[in-house]
C-alpha cells in the first residue's frame, strides 16, 4: 500500500511524521507523494483540509485519516499517544472506509468567461471583496426563492456543519446525510427587505443558484483558502457527485465528537 503524510509543520507533528514514515516503510509500505492509497494528516482540522485539497483529484483512489496534535478535531480521530497502535493497524489491517458528501461550487463569469468548479469538504463562504452587503437573487430548483441582502451566505456540508455554519446559528447535521445547508450571515431585514431568516437544508437533487444583482467583486472562501472573483454571473451550489473517503480503524461516533467539543466539560 502507498501512503503519504501531510504535517502541520510544527515540531511535534514533524516528529510523528518522521516516526510513522520510518516504521510504516519498515513494515513494507511505500511512501508515495503522487499516488497514495492512504493520506495521513498530522496536525488539526486545518491540516486535514489542506491534505484533502492536495489530493482532491484522487478521491476515488485515496482515503484519509487524521492525527490531532492540538485540540480535538472533527477530522482527526487519533491522538499522539495512539500513534504506535495506528501504525500497526495501518500495516496489518485492511482498512474500512466511510464516505461522506461534499459540496460542489461552480462559479460562472459573465460574457463567456471561464467556469470554475471547486469541491469543499467543510463550506463555501461568500462575501463581497470590499465588505459591502451582498445582494443575491436566490434560486432553488430553478425557481426564485428570495432576494438576499446581508454580509454573506455560507453553504456547508454536513461534516462541515460544526464549523462556520454553527457559528452563524446553523444546524448540526450528521455527515451521513447527503445534503447541503445554506445559512445567512447578518441578513438585512426591515419593512423593505426580507429574507427567510432561517438555515435551509437542501437534499442532493436540489440545486441552489446565487445570482448577483449588483456588480461586485466577491471573496469566496472554500474551506481554508480564499479566492477573489470578478464579473460573476452565478454561483451554483449542490451536493457533489464525488465523496470523501475516511479510513476507519476504530469507532468514534459523530455525536460523541459533538458532545466532547461543545458540551462536555472534559472536551
UniProtKB/Swiss-Prot annotation:
Residues engaged in binding NAD(+): 45-46, 122-123, 149, 151, 186
InterPro entries noted in UniProt: ATP-NAD_kinase_N, ATP-NAD_kinase_PpnK-typ_C, NAD/diacylglycerol_kinase_sf, NADK
Molecular functions per Gene Ontology: ATP binding; metal ion binding; NAD binding; NAD+ kinase activity
Pfam families named in the record: NAD_kinase, NAD_kinase_C
The reaction(s) this protein catalyses: NAD(+) + ATP = ADP + NADP(+) + H(+)
Keywords from the UniProt entry: ATP-binding, Cytoplasm, Kinase, NAD, NADP, Nucleotide-binding, Transferase
Enzyme nomenclature, EC number: 2.7.1.23
GO BP: any one term: NADP biosynthetic process
Subcellular location: Cytoplasm
Keyword set includes Membrane: no
Enzyme superclass (EC): transferase
Active site (record annotation): 45 (proton acceptor)
A GO CC term attached to the entry: cytoplasm
Similarity-based family: Belongs to the NAD kinase family.
Function: Involved in the regulation of the intracellular balance of NAD and NADP, and is a key enzyme in the biosynthesis of NADP. Catalyzes specifically the phosphorylation on 2'-hydroxyl of the adenosine moiety of NAD to yield NADP.
Name this polypeptide is given: NAD kinase 1
Lineage: Bacteria, Bacillati, Bacillota, Bacilli, Bacillales
Amino acid at each position: 500500500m502507498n501512503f503519504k503524510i501531510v504535517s502541520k509543520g510544527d515540531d511535534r507533528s514533524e516528529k510523528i511524521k518522521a516516526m510513522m514514515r520510518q516504521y510504516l516503510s519498515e513494515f513494507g509500505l511505500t511512501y508515495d507523494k503522487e499516488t497514495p492509497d492512504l493520506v495521513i494528516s498530522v496536525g488539526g482540522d486545518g491540516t486535514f483540509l489542506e491534505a484533502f485539497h492536495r489530493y482532491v483529484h484522487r478521491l476515488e483512489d485515496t482515503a484519509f485519516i487524521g492525527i490531532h496534535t492540538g485540540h480535538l478535531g472533527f477530522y482527526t480521530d487519533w491522538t499522539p499517544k495512539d500513534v504506535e497502535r495506528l501504525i500497526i493497524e495501518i500495516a496489518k489491517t485492511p482498512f474500512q472506509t466511510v464516505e461522506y458528501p461534499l459540496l460542489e461550487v461552480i462559479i460562472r463569469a459573465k460574457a463567456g468567461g471561464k467556469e470554475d468548479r471547486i469541491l469543499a469538504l467543510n463550506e463555501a463562504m461568500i462575501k463581497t471583496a470590499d465588505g459591502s452587503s451582498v445582494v443575491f437573487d436566490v434560486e432553488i430548483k430553478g425557481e426564485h426563492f428570495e432576494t438576499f441582502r446581508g454580509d454573506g451566505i455560507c453553504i456547508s456540508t454536513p461534516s462541515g456543519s460544526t464549523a462556520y455554519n454553527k457559528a452563524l446559528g446553523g444546524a448540526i447535521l450528521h455527515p451521513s446525510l447527503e445534503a447541503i445547508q445554506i445559512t445567512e450571515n447578518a441578513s438585512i431585514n426591515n419593512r423593505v427587505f426580507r429574507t427567510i431568516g432561517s438555515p435551509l437544508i437542501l437534499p442532493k437533487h436540489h440545486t441552489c443558484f446565487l445570482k448577483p444583482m449588483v456588480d461586485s467583486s466577491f471573496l469566496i472562501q472554500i474551506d481554508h483558502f480564499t479566492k477573489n472573483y470578478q464579473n460573476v454571473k452565478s454561483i451554483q451550489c449542490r451536493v457533489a457527485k464525488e465523496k470523501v473517503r475516511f479510513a476507519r480503524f476504530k469507532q468514534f461516533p459523530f455525536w460523541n465528537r459533538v458532545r466532547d467539543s461543545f458540551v462536555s466539560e472534559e472536551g
